[in-house]
Amino acid sequence: MKLFHNKMSVLRNILVGTTIVVTASSAFAHVKLESATPTINASIASQPKSIALNFGGEVMLMNVKLLDAQRRDIPLNYQVSHDLKKTFEVAVPKLKNGKYTVVWTTMGTDGHNMSGEYNFTIKSTK
């Protein structure tokens, strides 16, 4: 009987430990950028009207920047909102031909910040 009780205690401890690890892993899973417009690493022929960032889960977009080829900041009219969303759209000013970098920072529901960047290029169709 004691042997059965010891085996059950070990089994219970394994199940509790596994549950804690799985719960912690999903709670701290970070949301990734799934897609964007202009598309990541795209060469586009015309001026985009906006930048759209599509994430795999709901986040707050804490910051978004647009940088030119020399990594100079191009002002965007973006105000931080505490709304949790999957998709954010930011208007873009008139841009010249060239390479641009979108830099973003989000905060997930777990309070962790995630950041990333991607490039796109505007090429003339002349």
What do the predicted segments below correspond to?
Residues 2-15:
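Bacterial N-terminal signal peptides that target proteins for export
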Residues 16-17, 27:
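Cleavable N-terminal signal peptides
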Residues 28-62, 124-126:
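N-terminal non-catalytic regions of secreted/periplasmic and cell-surface proteins
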Residues 52-122:
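Acidic, low-complexity Ser/Thr/Gly/Pro-rich repeat segments typical of extracellular/periplasmic
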